[in-house]
Amino acid sequence: MISSSIIKNIKSECETGLASVAYYYFDYKDKDKQGVRGLLSSLLSQLCARSQDSYDILQSLYGIHQNGLEQPNEGDLFQTLKKVLELRHHGRVYIVMDAVDENPNTHGIPTPREDVLQLIKELVDLRHPDIRICVTSRPEEDIKMALERSASHDVSLHAQEGQRSDIIDYIRSVVEFDRNIQQKWRAEDRKLVVDSLSKNAKGM
């Protein structure tokens, strides 16, 4: 999976500098891996393992809910995540969400997919200078429409055998010449994106 390569490359960077990564794989076959509750819980557990301060924030949430006898609601989980992300010693934080399209979608009623897309928007709206969010998904119309309003950039990969070099050239040109990316992303971030996507371009 392309997200696995992205995560692997980010982890390599985290080993050499002040950065953190948290990731989540949605799964249409597992209800526990759909919607925002599992996502938020997983992101918190990964990020709170990084420092005592972030762990203390999580413990505070745990204490408020009778030391685990009650389940925090999704709003409480999100507010706790915001507090953790505000800790400066995390450095740059990469959040990777894979296969958003595997959240079910039923038109006309609230769905896990809509909740996830709203959460992504709220994370982007934090405008945190050290947060980088990567979302992968099939290009389904509702997801495209939601993410287009929040994404600083998107890369679409569709290839047949033999087109890998063309895709790599396309990725490199987008990352290197897009003015918005040039202004917002550091050189090492741009290189990380190119390397990660290029390694998995074949057959996408």
Residue spans for each PLM region:
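Conserved NB-ARC/NACHT P-loop NTPase core of NLR-like innate immune receptors
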Residues: 1-204
